[in-house]
């Protein structure tokens, strides 16, 4: 895949608007301001293709990006305290509507801030994917903010804090240093190649 060819395709505000699509999809999920858009921009090798929000929780849309026919999907961030109950319900309906629809979602990249204990919403999302047998990896973001000993401490803590941690692929990522970006691309390439071989 040539990630430099990534283009913004569309944004959808309700599950009914979501396109019926048979293309491979990779989705990105995480707390508001955990760095989803920044991570996607790093993968695409672009500075500002994925929209980085200065007002977390304001925009509740599922944003689709196309890379040579493969879809990269930015799910709206969750857990922002200042949104209304109606917006929270809209978020829930939209995200669940996307994840539970008949789509070819090959992988969900679940972002968790590497510096902190996973939030209640993070754990809820992880359990949702486990319960529904969805393929996912956890990207531990902003790892450049941790020194070696802090990283080891958080690594051990995550094994206790995250359900089924020993069965989940977790990777350190940083959009500042580029750590983990090539590893994620390799996973995407492998999953896309698997599909081409089946065809």
Regions found by a protein language model. Name each.
Residues 1-82, 198:
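Conserved G1/Walker A P-loop phosphate-binding module
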Residues 3-15, 145-199:
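Canonical P-loop GTPase G-domain recognition
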Residues 22-23, 41-43, 86-88, 123-127, ...:
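Short, glycine/charged-enriched secondary-structure capping and boundary segments
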Residues 45-49, 101, 131, 190, ...:
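Conserved amphipathic alpha-helical interaction elements at protein-protein interfaces in regulatory
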Residues 58, 70, 77-80, 115-117, ...:
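Conserved nucleotide-binding/hydrolysis micro-motifs of P-loop NTPases
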Residues 67-105:
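Conserved nucleotide-sensing/catalytic segment adjacent to the nucleotide-binding pocket
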Residues 88-92, 102, 119, 123, ...:
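Amphipathic alpha-helical transducer elements in NTP-driven molecular machines
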Residues 96-168:
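Conserved C-terminal guanine-recognition region of P-loop GTPase G domains, centered on the G4
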